[in-house]
Amino acid sequence: MNVAAGGTSAAAGSASNNNALPMAQLADGWLELESDPGLFTLLLEDFGCHDVQVEEVYDLQKPIESPYGFIFLFRWIEERRARRKIVETTAEIFVKDEEAISSIFFAQQVVPNSCATHALLSVLLNCNENNLQLGETLSRLKAHTKGMSPENKGLAIGNTPELACAHNSHAMPQARRRLERTGAGVASCRFTGEAFHFVSFVPINGQLFELDGLKPYPMNHGCWEEHEDWTDKFRRVMADRLGIATGEQDIRFNLMAVVPDRRIAITHKLKMLRTNQAIVSGTLQKLLKADEQGDDQQRPDTPNTLLEPSAFTARDLQSLLKNLDTEIAINEQHLADENDRRQMFKVDASRRTHNYDKFICTFLSMLAHQGVLGELVSQHLLPTKKISGQSAANRLSKQSSAATANTANSAANATAGKSQPQQQQQQQQQQPQSQAAKNGKSPGKTPGRRRKGRNKCRKRK
């Protein structure tokens, strides 16, 4: 173990000085990383591997073009019943042959919080070097760890300064504070306190391997059929795995694919389209010139680099040229989108890794010094109180308005009910008054009222 760590440290000694990261802090200073494809893509660039990118997989059944491998993020809780089922299932496919293990790159995770880097290296260092340019750091690591045990390979990863610095440079400030507060352990996703873990799925020598740094051995899921791609085998394995893992309705997982850099393929296609565009345009110019001269006997043919030699009319070439122009415009837009996406990865990384604590503390201190902080805090707290008070006031006003409306309705009904009898009584009173006026008597007094008046006068006397 000491030989593996020391050898890698010596090979990368100059890089440790440049990165200013003490070797004593490498083994216990790795920070947690988020599960983000943009972060992983930039991390690969920092490793020195510029021809790959990481994409998130949303649909397992959707075909993926030329993937190097897959990275699976899942919840890691040992006591779960589903977890025990997975362990019992995978124990049957462990590869325990030392020669077979040493022939592939399988490293045990001996450094906490390094599972993201382990997952990426498990994919990249098991790819064919003819199809992928690893870069100086990864090429040196692969050559140095050839034939080592999985434990020594894990120590070599932990003691490589370039990998440690690149890994920690993409961590959020909360990760460092959390490491100082709780210590190292299994990586947790987005700092929620729940443990998550990365594993890799990669094709090796016609067989699908699952490489998990927390397992003692690599797992061989077997070969795929002759008529299918290795990704078909991977889909079946993942379908079974998710069926077991989601037995308790826990579907929190993330799947990412390590694929070639899309910009390289688009750039190559644009180069081919522009070459064909120049050929067709030149042939069309010659054809138009020949038609102007009336030389139909020597009509030019399209070169065999585009199609088989055959006579084309000017209209055919113009239509072909128009299609090429459209394809070029579409691919130029795709290339611009990929470049914008890569730039957005960098912007998100800057926002993710920047420590805003000093700015926030200074800003709040200036507000307090100017005597504005208390007022701002009260203004932001009052709306909540106002909303609760207004809701109560609204309820009271609604109740009072409803009571007032009910009272008004009842009064209106009572008034409407008494209006007809009162009209009849008034009509009856008006008839004797009119008769009394004719007879010369007072119209406003009745016999009963006169008696009451006389009684009152007697009492006064």
From Swiss-Prot:
It is found in: Nucleus. The record marks 109 as: Transition state stabilizer. InterPro entries: Papain-like_cys_pep_sf (IPR038765), Peptidase_C12_UCH (IPR001578), Peptidase_C12_UCH_sf (IPR036959), UCH_C (IPR041507). Transmembrane segments: none annotated. It comes from the Eukaryota. It catalyses: Thiol-dependent hydrolysis of ester, thioester, amide, peptide and isopeptide bonds formed by the C-terminal Gly of ubiquitin (a 76-residue protein attached to proteins as an intracellular targeting signal). Residues 29-260 form the UCH catalytic domain. Its EC number is 3.4.19.12. One of its GO terms (cellular component) is cytoplasm. The active site is at residues 115, 197. Residues 400-446 have a biased composition (Low complexity). The record marks 212 as: Important for enzyme activity. One of its GO terms (biological process) is ubiquitin-dependent protein catabolic process. Residues 355-383 form the ULD domain. Residues 447-461 have a biased composition (Basic residues). Residues 392-461 are annotated as: Disordered. Belongs to the peptidase C12 family. BAP1 subfamily. Catalytic component of the polycomb repressive deubiquitinase (PR-DUB) complex, a complex that specifically mediates deubiquitination of histone H2A monoubiquitinated at 'Lys-119' (H2AK118ub1). Mediates bisymmetric organization of the PR-DUB complex and is involved in association with nucleosomes to mediate deubiquitination. Does not deubiquitinate monoubiquitinated histone H2B. Required to maintain the transcriptionally repressive state of homeotic genes throughout development. The PR-DUB complex has weak or no activity toward 'Lys-48'- and 'Lys-63'-linked polyubiquitin chains. Catalytic component of the polycomb repressive deubiquitinase (PR-DUB) complex, at least composed of caly/calypso, Asx and sba (MBD5/6 homolog). The PR-DUB complex associates with nucleosomes to mediate deubiquitination of histone H2AK118ub1 substrates; the association requires the positively charged C-terminal tail of caly, probably due to direct binding of DNA. Interacts (via ULD domain) with Asx (via DEUBAD domain); the interaction produces a stable heterodimer with a composite binding site for ubiquitin. This is Ubiquitin carboxyl-terminal hydrolase calypso. The lineage of its organism: Eukaryota, Metazoa, Ecdysozoa, Arthropoda, Hexapoda.
